[in-house]
Structure formats: C-alpha cells, structure tokens
Design a protein with these regions (language model features):
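Active-site catalytic microenvironments for nucleophilic, acid-base chemistry
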Residues: 6, 110, 135
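SAM-dependent Rossmann-like transferase core, predominantly class I methyltransferases
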Residues: 29-112, 116, 121-128
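Short, solvent-exposed loop/helix junctions and linker helices
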Residues: 24-28, 66-69, 191-195
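N-terminal accessory segments
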Residues: 1-46
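S-adenosylmethionine
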Residues: 113-115, 119-201
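Active-site/binding-pocket entry motifs
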Residues: 9, 65-66, 167
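A secondary-structure boundary/capping signal
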Residues: 19, 62-63, 164
C-alpha cells in the first residue's frame, strides 16, 4: 500500500477516499514495474521510493547507502537522556560511519549548540549525506569528512561521539535476506565476528 500511495503521490495517511479510484494505463504500468522490482528483484522499498523514515524525519536514500534503521534515532529523540544532563552543553559531536547522514542530522537537531563532524569511508555515501544535510539546512553545522574512522581526525576532540558502525558477522552476512544484498556490504559486514570496526572505535 505504501509503495502504491507514494508512487501515485497520494497522501500516506488517507487511504479510504481513494479505494474506489481507477488507475490509468500509465499508472498501471508504473506500478507493475514497481511491484516487479520489489517482489521479483527484491529491491528494498526505500530504494524504490528514494526515502526512508526515522520517526517523523524523512531522508533521501539510494543504493549507495544502507537503509537507515538505527535505534539510536529513538535515543536522540530524548537527547540521549539520562546520559546527557544538559543538551545545550554539547558543542561538538562526531558521527562515525555516517552513511546517509541521518544520525548526524538528528544529532544536530537534538543538540542545537553542537557543530557536527560526519565521517564515512565511502565518497558515495557522503554524496547522499550531503543531499540530506542540505535538505535540513544544516550545511553550516554539519561537516562531511571522507575518512577511515579517525584517520583524518587527528588532534580533534568531541563532546559527544555516536556511531552505527558495520557490525554483522561473516556468517550472518551470508545468510541475510536478498534485500540486504542490494545494500553496500561495506556498511554491513565487519569481519568474521562482526567486531572489526568496533575494535577500532
């Protein structure tokens, strides 16, 4: 239903008024192609719509980044309470493995005084992040950096560091559903036990 409503530019929260509507031939062809790509090719819905949601926040995504699905977003909704006593005291923050930039953006929204460094190894991912940062009008507060973890951050310190790094072990990567095979493996797998990048942090 979501794919249909999104593709036809219909409101996602009001299905009933359109239940008796008839599709035009071009609309039927468009939807048939969409359903084929989703059901036969097993493309993630987020790649078909070029959008993913974390709570009420929409982000652009494509196959250059993994589909955002981090529980950290829920923690940021609460400004990381109880671990952060004074959100206004956070003046600098780092998002390692930023991907689409969604967590960096949510961090900037949660901590209004913070300047963000958003780091990723992938230039492709950073291109997607740049689009999202611009969409949220945060280019003056979120700096995008191509770096392998802390390599290009020597000497820099941060009040807060967040990260949703690759953490899937090799056995689990091999057993993932077909949808995950369309996502960048660099952002999912992290060695035999899934902890290669975590050890770096």
């Amino acid at each position: 239903v979501y794919l249909t409503l999104h593709t036809l530019s219909l409101p996602l929260d009001r299905l009933e008024p359109f239940l008796d509507a008839r599709l035009l031939p071009p609309e039927r062809e468009l939807l048939l192609d969409l359903y084929t790509r989703r059901c036969q090719d097993r493309l993630p819905a987020a790649y078909l719509t070029n959008e993913a949601w974390l709570g009420e926040h929409r982000f652009y995504v494509d196959d250059r980044v993994i589909v955002p699905r981090s529980f950290i977003a829920e923690l940021l909704d609460e400004q990381l309470a109880p671990w952060i006593d004074d959100p206004w005291a956070i003046e600098s923050a780092l998002d390692l493995c930023t991907g689409s930039g969604c967590l960096a953006i949510l961090t900037a929204l949660a901590f209004p005084n913070a300047e963000l460094a958003a780091v990723d190894l992938s230039d492709d991912a950073l291109s997607v992040a740049a689009r999202n940062v611009a969409d949220y009008h945060l280019t003056d507060r979120v700096e995008l950096i191509q770096s392998d973890a802390f390599t290009k951050l020597v000497g820099r310190k941060f009040d807060l560091i967040i990260s949703n790094p690759p953490y899937v072990n090799a056995e689990s990567v091999a057993a993932l559903p077909p949808e995950y095979l369309h996502e960048p493996e660099l952002a999912l797998g992290s060695g035999e036990d899934g902890l290669d990048f975590t050890r770096i942090i």
